[in-house]
Protein backbone atom coordinates (compact mmCIF):
# COMPACT_ATOMS: atom_id res chain seq x y z
CA UNK A 1 0.00 0.00 0.00
CA UNK A 2 1.03 3.60 -0.58
CA UNK A 3 1.25 6.00 2.36
CA UNK A 4 -0.04 9.24 0.87
CA UNK A 5 1.21 11.12 3.93
CA UNK A 6 4.77 10.35 2.83
CA UNK A 7 5.58 12.80 0.01
CA UNK A 8 8.79 11.03 -0.95
CA UNK A 9 7.04 7.66 -1.16
CA UNK A 10 4.39 9.21 -3.40
CA UNK A 11 7.06 10.61 -5.74
CA UNK A 12 8.80 7.23 -5.91
CA UNK A 13 5.47 5.53 -6.66
CA UNK A 14 4.64 7.91 -9.51
CA UNK A 15 8.11 7.52 -11.02
CA UNK A 16 7.76 3.73 -10.81
CA UNK A 17 4.41 3.87 -12.62
CA UNK A 18 5.92 6.08 -15.33
CA UNK A 19 8.88 3.73 -15.72
CA UNK A 20 6.64 0.67 -16.03
CA UNK A 21 3.78 2.13 -18.07
CA UNK A 22 5.58 4.83 -20.01
CA UNK A 23 3.25 7.58 -18.83
CA UNK A 24 0.07 8.28 -16.88
CA UNK A 25 -2.94 8.84 -19.14
CA UNK A 26 -5.65 9.00 -16.46
CA UNK A 27 -5.41 9.99 -12.80
CA UNK A 28 -8.36 9.38 -10.48
CA UNK A 29 -8.04 11.21 -7.17
CA UNK A 30 -10.25 9.21 -4.82
CA UNK A 31 -8.14 8.87 -1.68
CA UNK A 32 -10.19 9.80 1.38
CA UNK A 33 -10.39 8.38 4.87
CA UNK A 34 -14.16 8.07 4.45
CA UNK A 35 -16.38 6.68 7.13
CA UNK A 36 -13.43 6.35 9.50
CA UNK A 37 -13.42 10.15 9.92
CA UNK A 38 -17.03 10.99 9.06
CA UNK A 39 -19.03 8.44 11.04
CA UNK A 40 -17.71 9.20 14.56
CA UNK A 41 -18.76 12.84 14.19
CA UNK A 42 -22.19 12.36 12.58
CA UNK A 43 -24.85 14.46 14.28
CA UNK A 44 -22.30 16.81 15.84
CA UNK A 45 -22.05 20.49 14.95
CA UNK A 46 -18.72 21.77 13.64
CA UNK A 47 -18.06 23.45 17.01
CA UNK A 48 -18.60 20.15 18.82
CA UNK A 49 -16.04 18.23 16.77
CA UNK A 50 -12.29 18.08 17.40
CA UNK A 51 -10.26 20.28 15.05
CA UNK A 52 -8.53 17.14 13.81
CA UNK A 53 -11.76 16.18 12.03
CA UNK A 54 -11.23 19.09 9.63
CA UNK A 55 -7.63 18.07 8.99
CA UNK A 56 -8.65 14.44 8.45
CA UNK A 57 -11.10 15.50 5.75
CA UNK A 58 -8.87 18.09 4.09
CA UNK A 59 -5.98 15.66 3.74
CA UNK A 60 -7.88 14.27 0.73
CA UNK A 61 -7.51 17.62 -1.05
CA UNK A 62 -3.77 17.75 -0.38
CA UNK A 63 -3.33 14.20 -1.69
CA UNK A 64 -5.28 15.04 -4.86
CA UNK A 65 -3.21 18.19 -5.37
CA UNK A 66 0.07 16.34 -4.84
CA UNK A 67 -0.75 13.49 -7.22
CA UNK A 68 -2.04 15.89 -9.87
CA UNK A 69 1.10 18.02 -9.59
CA UNK A 70 3.29 14.95 -10.10
CA UNK A 71 1.50 13.54 -13.16
CA UNK A 72 0.44 16.76 -14.93
CA UNK A 73 3.85 17.57 -16.49
CA UNK A 74 3.92 14.25 -18.35
CA UNK A 75 0.34 14.73 -19.51
CA UNK A 76 1.08 18.25 -20.74
CA UNK A 77 4.16 17.00 -22.57
CA UNK A 78 2.03 14.30 -24.24
CA UNK A 79 -0.70 16.88 -24.98
CA UNK A 80 -3.22 14.38 -23.59
CA UNK A 81 -4.53 13.31 -20.22
CA UNK A 82 -7.45 13.24 -17.81
CA UNK A 83 -7.48 14.11 -14.11
CA UNK A 84 -10.66 13.13 -12.24
CA UNK A 85 -11.38 14.26 -8.69
CA UNK A 86 -13.98 12.02 -7.06
CA UNK A 87 -16.22 14.37 -5.10
CA UNK A 88 -19.82 14.42 -3.93
CA UNK A 89 -23.05 16.36 -3.92
CA UNK A 90 -21.80 17.36 -0.47
CA UNK A 91 -19.70 19.95 -2.30
CA UNK A 92 -22.85 21.73 -3.41
CA UNK A 93 -25.26 21.23 -0.52
CA UNK A 94 -25.12 20.33 3.16
CA UNK A 95 -24.45 16.62 3.63
CA UNK A 96 -23.26 14.89 6.82
CA UNK A 97 -21.09 17.67 8.30
CA UNK A 98 -19.29 20.95 7.71
CA UNK A 99 -15.83 19.37 7.20
CA UNK A 100 -17.35 16.90 4.71
CA UNK A 101 -18.86 19.71 2.65
CA UNK A 102 -15.80 21.94 2.76
CA UNK A 103 -13.58 19.07 1.60
CA UNK A 104 -15.80 18.23 -1.37
CA UNK A 105 -16.20 21.90 -2.32
CA UNK A 106 -12.41 22.13 -2.33
CA UNK A 107 -12.12 19.04 -4.54
CA UNK A 108 -14.53 20.64 -7.01
CA UNK A 109 -12.63 23.93 -6.96
CA UNK A 110 -9.31 22.12 -7.38
CA UNK A 111 -10.57 20.51 -10.59
CA UNK A 112 -11.94 23.83 -11.87
CA UNK A 113 -8.75 25.78 -11.20
CA UNK A 114 -6.46 23.06 -12.55
CA UNK A 115 -8.60 23.07 -15.71
CA UNK A 116 -8.03 26.81 -16.07
CA UNK A 117 -4.27 26.35 -15.87
CA UNK A 118 -4.39 23.31 -18.20
CA UNK A 119 -6.44 25.06 -20.88
CA UNK A 120 -5.00 24.53 -24.34
CA UNK A 121 -2.69 21.69 -23.26
CA UNK A 122 -4.93 18.80 -24.27
CA UNK A 123 -5.26 17.78 -20.61
CA UNK A 124 -8.66 17.89 -18.88
CA UNK A 125 -9.49 18.07 -15.18
CA UNK A 126 -13.00 17.33 -13.94
CA UNK A 127 -14.85 16.66 -10.72
CA UNK A 128 -17.04 13.56 -10.64
CA UNK A 129 -20.04 13.19 -8.34
CA UNK A 130 -21.09 9.57 -7.84
CA UNK A 131 -24.35 8.91 -6.03
CA UNK A 132 -24.87 7.01 -2.79
CA UNK A 133 -22.67 3.95 -2.76
CA UNK A 134 -23.26 0.25 -2.30
CA UNK A 135 -19.99 -1.09 -0.90
CA UNK A 136 -18.84 -3.44 1.84
CA UNK A 137 -19.31 -0.60 4.37
CA UNK A 138 -22.29 1.39 3.02
CA UNK A 139 -25.51 0.55 1.27
CA UNK A 140 -27.77 3.37 0.10
CA UNK A 141 -31.05 1.97 -1.29
CA UNK A 142 -30.76 1.53 -5.07
CA UNK A 143 -27.29 3.04 -4.84
CA UNK A 144 -24.30 2.85 -7.15
CA UNK A 145 -21.52 0.29 -6.99
CA UNK A 146 -17.95 1.58 -7.30
CA UNK A 147 -17.91 0.07 -10.80
CA UNK A 148 -20.43 2.71 -11.94
CA UNK A 149 -17.97 5.54 -11.25
CA UNK A 150 -15.24 3.44 -12.86
CA UNK A 151 -17.31 3.10 -16.00
CA UNK A 152 -17.91 6.85 -16.01
CA UNK A 153 -14.16 7.49 -15.88
CA UNK A 154 -13.51 4.92 -18.61
CA UNK A 155 -16.17 6.52 -20.83
CA UNK A 156 -14.63 9.96 -20.34
CA UNK A 157 -11.13 8.68 -21.07
CA UNK A 158 -12.33 7.03 -24.27
CA UNK A 159 -14.28 10.09 -25.40
CA UNK A 160 -11.22 11.95 -26.62
CA UNK A 161 -11.49 15.74 -26.67
CA UNK A 162 -12.80 16.81 -23.26
CA UNK A 163 -12.13 20.55 -23.51
CA UNK A 164 -15.84 21.35 -23.16
CA UNK A 165 -16.10 19.27 -19.98
CA UNK A 166 -12.81 20.31 -18.38
CA UNK A 167 -13.31 22.22 -15.13
CA UNK A 168 -16.89 21.06 -14.76
CA UNK A 169 -18.69 18.97 -12.16
CA UNK A 170 -19.94 15.81 -13.86
CA UNK A 171 -22.43 13.32 -12.45
CA UNK A 172 -22.14 9.59 -12.96
CA UNK A 173 -25.83 9.20 -13.81
CA UNK A 174 -25.68 11.92 -16.47
CA UNK A 175 -22.54 10.42 -18.01
CA UNK A 176 -24.26 7.02 -18.08
CA UNK A 177 -27.08 8.53 -20.12
CA UNK A 178 -24.66 10.37 -22.42
CA UNK A 179 -22.29 7.45 -23.03
CA UNK A 180 -24.73 4.55 -22.69
CA UNK A 181 -23.44 2.48 -19.79
CA UNK A 182 -25.14 0.93 -16.74
CA UNK A 183 -23.96 -0.22 -13.33
CA UNK A 184 -22.33 -3.60 -12.73
CA UNK A 185 -25.76 -4.80 -11.60
CA UNK A 186 -27.12 -4.10 -15.08
CA UNK A 187 -29.32 -1.33 -13.69
CA UNK A 188 -29.29 2.44 -13.74
CA UNK A 189 -29.08 3.64 -10.10
CA UNK A 190 -32.21 5.57 -9.16
CA UNK A 191 -31.97 5.94 -5.37
CA UNK A 192 -32.55 9.24 -3.60
CA UNK A 193 -28.77 9.57 -3.41
CA UNK A 194 -28.25 8.97 -7.14
CA UNK A 195 -25.72 11.51 -8.39
CA UNK A 196 -27.27 14.93 -8.65
CA UNK A 197 -30.49 14.01 -6.84
CA UNK A 198 -31.82 17.10 -5.15
CA UNK A 199 -29.05 19.32 -6.52
Name each model feature, range by range.
Residues 1-13, 51:
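The beta1-alpha1 cofactor-binding region of Rossmann-like NAD(H)/NADP(H)-dependent oxidoreductases
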Residues 2-6, 133, 175:
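Hydrophobic pocket-lining residues within nucleotide cofactor-binding pockets
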Residues 16-29, 35, 66, 124:
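A glycine-rich helix->loop->beta "capping" turn
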Residues 20, 78, 159-162:
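Generic structural signal for alpha-helix termini and adjacent loop/cap motifs
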Residues 33-37, 45-53, 57-60, 76, ...:
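Catalytic loop of short-chain dehydrogenase/reductase
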Residues 39-46, 183-188:
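Short, flexible, mixed-charge acidic loops at enzyme active sites
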Residues 62, 120, 127-128, 140-199:
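C-terminal helical subdomain
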Residues 68-69, 112:
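A short, exposed helix-loop element centered on a Lys and neighboring polar residues
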